């Protein structure tokens, strides 16, 4: 009851002052805060993802906060939109929380603060099922960031192939061609590029055959690592 009174009183003050800030906060107790997020009526693409990222940055400023409960039902929208927009919000929140702290030693806790979030909603199961799609993207983004952040003397071609092999558990078909196989295929131009390195040259193909029949023509990406 006291908490509701505090929040309602705070909301009235915000309305009276015509505050335009996206995020505001109020102290509930010595260890708890209530964050109020203002949702715009006019929204551009990726609005909720960006808002989630902004919210993470806002919350991270408070040293004593390591976890938060996020109430989705306060978003005044129909069920389908609420599920979609809240999933996007959590996606942005989690993406913003990424840090590559493997080699950090000084102020590591301060620089790599993690904040757990718990969804509080009557549509929890729907949101969790919908978020699986976003979580797969998030995991891919984090893996990519981890790999590109590694120094080249650590993530050499051999080590890189070992990391790629791990993706086979997701259903990807992975083939790794070493120098012997590349020579046999006559791929001498590729081998020539690697002659200046002490590390062995590899070529990796990754295939995903999970598309539906009506997807259209196959897609192929070619890149040099």
Language model regions located:
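Short amphipathic alpha-helical segment within the helicase RecA-like ATPase core
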Residues: 1-219, 224-225
